[in-house]
């Protein structure tokens, strides 16, 4: 099953597609009906006999999902930083085009250096 990251009607430059980082594929989850058919009904009598995973138990699926989420957060952070750099460059260009206008009279608000990125959590692996 081929999955495309871009919208079919949107033209994406070849350079952008070449630099694209593939996201982790999602695993299909069973439907509610499949769960009901494959598992016994939970009642007050058999709830106590249900084995719960221990605290140290970490299924491979969960670790894979966490690693995927971590990689996606890293990618989103990188994209946000690139977008802020583009906005700062755009603001500098607009300022150079209109040097006679004072910053107090400008219709564009001044951007402080990376206002959003200062509040992003720092992830470490």
Curated annotation (Swiss-Prot):
GO cellular component: cytoplasm
Biased composition (Low complexity): 103-125
Region ranges (Disordered): 1-21, 97-125
UniProt-recorded Gene Ontology molecular function terms: protein-folding chaperone binding
Pfam family, one: SSTK-IP
Keyword Chaperone appears in the UniProt entry: yes
Origin: domain of life: Eukaryota
Subunit (UniProt): Interacts with HSP70. Associates with HSP90. Interacts with TSSK6; this interaction is direct and recruits TSACC to HSP90.
Protein name, per record: TSSK6-activating co-chaperone protein
């Amino acid at each position: 099953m081929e999955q495309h990251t871009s919208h079919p009607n949107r033209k994406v430059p070849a350079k952008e597609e070449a630099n694209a980082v593939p996201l982790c594929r999602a695993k299909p989850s069973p439907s509610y009906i499949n769960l009901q058919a494959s598992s016994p009904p939970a009642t007050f009598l058999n709830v106590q006999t249900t084995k719960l995973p221990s605290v140290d138990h970490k299924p491979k699926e969960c670790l894979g999902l966490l690693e995927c989420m971590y990689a996606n957060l890293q990618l989103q952070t990188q994209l946000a930083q690139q977008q802020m750099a583009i906005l700062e460059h755009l603001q500098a260009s607009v300022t150079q085009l209109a040097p006679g206008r004072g910053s107090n009279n400008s219709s564009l608000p001044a951007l402080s250096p990376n206002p959003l990125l200062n509040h992003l959590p720092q992830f470490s692996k």
